[in-house]
Amino acid sequence: MPTEKPTIIYTITDEAPALATYSLLPIIQSFTASSGINVDTRDISLAGRIIANFPDYLNEEQRIGDALAELGELAKTPEANIIKLPNISASVPQLQATIKELQSKGYALPNYPEEANTDEEKAVKATYDKIKGSAVNPVLREGNSDRRAPLSVKNYAKKNPHSMGAWSADSKSHVSSMDDKDFFGSEKSVTIEGATEVSIEFVGKDGAKKTLKPAFALQDKEIIDASVMNKAALVAFFEKEIASAKEQGVLLSLHMKATMMKVSDPVIFGHAVKVYYKDVFAKHGQLFNELGVDVNNGIGDVYAKIAALPQDQKQAIEADLQAVYETQPPLAMVDSDRGITNLHVPSDIIVDASMPAMLRSSGQMWDPKGKQKDTKAMIPDRSYASIYQAVIDFCKENGAFDPTTMGSVPNVGLMAQKAEEYGSHDKTFILEAAGQVQVVDASGSVLLEQDVEEGDIFRMCQVKDAPIQDWVKLAVTRARASGVPAVFWLDASRAHDAQLIEKVEAYLPEYDTDGLEIKILAPLEATQYSLVRIKEGLDTISVTGNVLRDYLTDLFPILELGTSAKMLSIVPLMNGGGLFETGAGGSAPKHVQQVEKENHLRWDSLGEFLALAASLEHLSVVTGNAKAQVLADALDKATGEFLDKNKSPSRRVGELDNRGSHYYLAAYWAKALAEQTVDADLAAEFAGVASQLAESEEAIVAELNNAQGPAGDLGGYYLLDDALVSSLMRPSSTLNAFIDA
């Protein structure tokens, strides 16, 4: 993107971070303007991505460019400097709600066809399917991941410890996984020798062949693997664990990643729904089929589809659903007051966030009466479930961790170029018949094959060699910079990991590792090793694949800091650019609900502050813009003062919220710029701003807090009304006058 000035791209996303952007971005643009830095935006919100992908259905004024595709290309260039805020990884219900809202605003978009029969329906469904799930991150992540808690954040957590639930040695909470016929148990893996093309073929019991995925390119030295989740074994697992939860008197919960693993995990979730509510499906299954109920969307889909039935028929089915709770173990609740259970929609309980929350709360989740209770956490596949059981066992023996003394676990994650499971969606298939699935190369040789039954889930993953080399290098770099042990979380008894271990052992000698402690441990042992060190106040770098990158950058920050949104998340892009992610949390729909109810936004923008400082520092290094480094250093100082003076948003209406926190950041940033002695021009420019912001503190905070209370009109949920939200998020005329001057 050739421009005269170096450009930072600030992404427009969804829900709470999107609202916060209306308040914070004008401050960022104002503070950076005189330093020759462009801060531009690109809309990668769910609504924006839908609009961009259906130009043929829209009129000229409604059409917008495909910002995500543009940023994907930018990420491959040395100029890339992208600040990426959390966005919605859409489930089908969220996708449908967005389409409905856009249609109501005059966008003549097609409905999402759950059953695609015609060619047009198939094309529409294919386009929407590309937008759902975690469609954004894999496009932008052209590098590996470096995530850690900045010192200022860690020190704040030690001085202001978050609550940690006490643990009992008698806790009945535990993780349950399959012991056979899951992805872990069936995995086969091979390293490619020489670039080739492969296709994925199904061969039926009768010998008939069907191409599941046409030929696609593989690079030399690429690792590929294939695994199968057996449907019959999965269903038997759910039946056994549901009975066991009842017998043990614990809550039943299911922890999946249906947003990212958008092909496999909703299907697994659907099987759990059908087994738990089996009496209702046995009685009303035919009607549900006629109504188009999709269990993969959760039991909420039953409620949605029966809503239009005659009142007595609807009430009879609802009574049957309620009766299930009399005979089955109680479900963990998402919202006890509204009766929303773990099985309501697949996007409500997401393993990387839900398990750490449970572990922080004495290993308990909420029951239907709104009380915390010991819980069985079902994580069907064994690949990574042991890490959570290890934390449960450790806390039962040693008690809860102490945030004032505990160590940290920064992460170096293998992520680039759609590595491993998180790039497998287009190679994941639900089999319609029994037979074999084969990965066949250009010469007709079968590289990998798996026996399958009807309904099984087949998955192929890949990871390229260049990202692995970059990952090993980043691990050594971080170990050297921080002086703490680095542990590769790889299991030699797992097919894919065995291939990776060979590469790690081959590439490590290429770097200077003298004096560094570098280990390779299976996830269970790596967790145990790290937990002992955490308890002793010691730090340990976790060097992991893509899924554990995701899981651990929630698990340890939530235990250490109370949230994963306060992590510094840097993606050094492989072609020299930088991607700066603002925390590892989601987009906080409940925060938006509070704004709609009482105009109070409790979103904490600390992740944005940290990412912006890292982005400015990167810009300074790459372009030689010395002012950018001064801005970054001053912002770091301001963030430290912001934390020390506890200016993060309150949860309560009438108190400081997101907007007030932005005022304090601006005031402290201006002060730090005015006081620094590296750049006299910036010091002079911000001296007046700093004194004006400081002197007007009382007036500005009053204007910001007094705006709260009445309902906040956003003019939409997925597609916000710019003018309305800008005015709502910038209610202080005093502050605006200084920022816009």
Regions found by a protein language model. Name each.
Residues 269, 710, 720-723:
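A generic structural micro-environment signature
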Residues 674-677:
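Ligand-binding pocket scaffold of soluble enzyme catalytic domains
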Residues 701-717:
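A glycine-biased, small/acidic residue-tolerant capping/turn segment at secondary-structure junctions
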Residues 720-741:
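C-terminal accessory extensions/subdomains outside the catalytic/core fold
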Residues 2-270, 278-503, 507, 511-523, ...:
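Extended, well-ordered protein cores
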Residues 683-691:
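Short, charged, amphipathic alpha-helical segments
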